[in-house]
Amino acid sequence: MSQLTHINAAGEAHMVDVSAKAETVREARAEAFVTMRSETLAMIIDGRHHKGDVFATARIAGIQAAKRTWDLIPLCHPLMLSKVEVNLQAEPEHNRVRIETLCRLTGKTGVEMEALTAASVAALTIYDMCKAVQKDMVIGPVRLLAKSGGKSGDFKVEADD
């Protein structure tokens, strides 16, 4: 079983020392969902939201969140991201929005937390913009889809049934 890397022998939280690690290309993809009533989703799709373009705002929020992950998650390293993508897709057949994010860099530590943070904040932004018309929207699941690069190797979520 793997050890927790952010806990020292005394059980105290600490930031991992990555100074001896090799720089490699690292990439991570994550997803989040926001489920809502069909009327709320139609308002977003049709561009009838009084606050403006929900998808554009959520996309920018997700990008900003990826860049600020180190400031939100206490033991994350500040990273020089080379790419952040936030894609939003309405899924009317499920009354939801699917958010997929991608983060990439060449560095000494992975970008999983950045991809997850981008997806989470984009979802929260959709909720924030639409809460005036629907307060019982559901955010989730939020999950890592894939990661590549680094010592721990590659990971890809199993295909959904």
Swiss-Prot record:
> Impact of mutating residue 51 to A?
Complete loss of activity
Q: Which organism is it from?
A: Escherichia coli (strain K12)
Which residues are catalytic?
128
Q: Which residues bind substrate?
A: 75-77, 113-114
MF terms in GO? cyclic pyranopterin monophosphate synthase activity; identical protein binding
- The UniProt record lists the keyword S-adenosyl-L-methionine: no
Q: What is this protein called?
A: Cyclic pyranopterin monophosphate synthase
Classification via HAMAP family: MoaC_B
> How does it associate, per the subunit comment?
Homohexamer; trimer of dimers.
Q: In which pathway does it act?
A: Cofactor biosynthesis; molybdopterin biosynthesis
**Enzyme group, top EC level?**
lyase
Q: What top-level branch of life does the organism fall under?
A: Bacteria
What EC number(s) does the entry state?
4.6.1.17
